[in-house]
Amino acid sequence: MNISKHITYAEAIKSQQAIRMRLSNEPTPEHLDNMKYLAENIFEPLRKHFKKPIAVTSFYRSELVNRAIGGSLASQHLQGEAMDIDAQVFGGLTNAEVFEWIKANLNYDQLIWENGTVTEPDWVHVSLTRRRANRKQNLRMFNNKYYTL
């Protein structure tokens, strides 16, 4: 089963921590709907624009998995509303390009430049919700501290 044209269900729920600890990482039907909404409205427009593969490094997280990795209790990954992407995995595209394109062209709740340098994040976190108005909040995270852009 696919979440969208370019994201498989297995890819969307994959977690190394869940595998190592034998934890369930299965979304509820509501969370699955949120995942599909995020994929169709953020990831697929990215793929269409750049015409290159982009790796999803973290998508859905169950409460057990989120707790095991020390994730925030308010993480939108828990609702299937957030994904971490890394354009550098396949080459030919930078995370900075992805960040700036999302910022300029898409509706989103949070867009986070995760670690890295001032010119290139290690990965990009992006979220989208249907529960309320999206904030279009732009942040940078360095050394576990968040800074508003």
Predicted regions and their residues:
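Extracytoplasmic cell-surface/polysaccharide-interacting catalytic and binding patches
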Residues: M1-R47, R140-L149
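Structural recognition of the beta-strand scaffold that forms the well-ordered cores
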Residues: A55-T57, A82-D86, H125-S127
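Short, surface-exposed glycine/acidic/tryptophan-bearing loops
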Residues: E63-M83
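Extended, low-complexity, intrinsically disordered C-terminal regulatory tails
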Residues: F43-I69
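Catalytic cores and adjacent binding grooves of peptidoglycan-active enzymes
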Residues: A87-L149
